[in-house]
Structure formats: C-alpha cells, structure tokens
From Swiss-Prot:
Family the entry assigns: Belongs to the small heat shock protein (HSP20) family.
InterPro entries in the cross-refs: A-crystallin/Hsp20_dom, HSP20-like_chaperone, HSP21-like
Keyword Protein biosynthesis: no
Keywords of this entry: Stress response
Recorded superkingdom: Bacteria
Gene name linked to the record: hspC1
Heme recorded as keyword: no
Protein name as annotated: Small heat shock protein C1
Record domain sHSP: where: 59-167
Gene source species: Rickettsia bellii (strain RML369-C)
Family annotation (Pfam families): HSP20
An individual GO BP term: response to heat
Length: 167
C-alpha cells in the first residue's frame, strides 16, 4: 500500500533522470542500466527521508491484540495477559453474571510541548466464566506488564435430575 503512493514519483524520477530511457529508438546499453540503478537509489533515499520525517510524529500502538494465556489447575483457573505500558490505574476488572470484563485504556496528550501528539492504547476482553468459579474471591495482580487474574474454583454439586411429566 505504501508503494502505491510513490508510483507517480517513481515514474517521474526514472523518466527525468535519463530522458533516453523513454526513447524506444535508442539502443539499450550498460549506461542505461547504470542510470536506472542511480535513479532507483535516489528514489529509495527520498522515500527513506520522507519516512524518517514522519517516524516519530505519529505515535501508535502496533498490536492487534493482547497476548493471553488461560491455565487450568485443580483449585483455580489463571488468566495471564501481557499488557506492556499499562499500570493498575489504566486497567479495570469487573464481574457481571457469568462474565469477566477486563478493560485497559491509556490516553496521553503530550503536554510537554505545544505539539498535537496524542496516543490512545486500549483493549477490551470479555471472558465467560465456568460454573465452578468462585466469583467472590477473584483476585488480580500486575507486575512488569503482566496481568495475572486468579479465579478460585469451588465444588459444584450436581443437582438431581427432575423428570418433567408430559401433559
């Protein structure tokens, strides 16, 4: 996609760098090849300069999702999530019904200078809880960008089957 924006510039540089390249009646020789390589190198340098110009001006979070892991143990489930850059004030964990909601949000307007630098990183996970999760004793911790949520398990008593009469 990036190259599409540069196609008109590529054509202009190649054609203007050596007019004989556009002349089909001229014999092809090594001078043309050298000129073409020089034109491509010049274009590559210009593209690099343009990329460097915007490199640190557009901060963004280059991740489509948070890496997570679900571990099942005898007495608990453990959810481990990699959340680099987030601290505990940026993350909210809630339980509603049989769902666990984990939300993270960072909004940063760079106030150190008069620029319009702005960053927003966020994630939103909804996890369906098993019936044997003790929702009253769920705990969490955050250390070095690793969020650990511990879901204690309780014994679920099987209910006796009830026969439904047919009318």
């Amino acid at each position: 996609m990036k190259i599409k924006a540069y196609i008109p510039a590529i054509a202009a540089v190649i054609l203007s760098s050596n007019a004989t390249l556009a002349n089909q009646n001229q014999a092809y020789n090594s001078n043309h090849t050298t000129s073409l390589h020089q034109a491509i190198e010049l274009l590559d340098n210009q593209i690099t300069n343009i990329d460097n110009l915007f490199k640190n001006k557009l901060p963004f979070y280059e991740s489509n999702s948070i890496k997570s892991k679900f571990i099942t143990k005898d007495k608990q489930y453990i959810i481990i999530m990699e959340v680099p850059g987030f601290d505990k004030d940026h993350i909210k964990i809630k339980v509603n019904g049989n769902k666990l909601f984990v939300k993270g949000n960072i909004e940063d307007k760079n106030k150190a200078d008069d620029s319009n630098n702005y960053m927003n990183k966020n994630f939103n996970y909804v996890i369906s809880l098993y019936e044997d999760v003790d929702q009253k004793n769920i705990s969490s911790s955050l250390k070095n960008g690793i969020l650990t949520i511990t879901l204690p398990r309780i014994e679920v008593k099987e209910q006796d089957a009830k026969e439904i009469p047919i009318n």
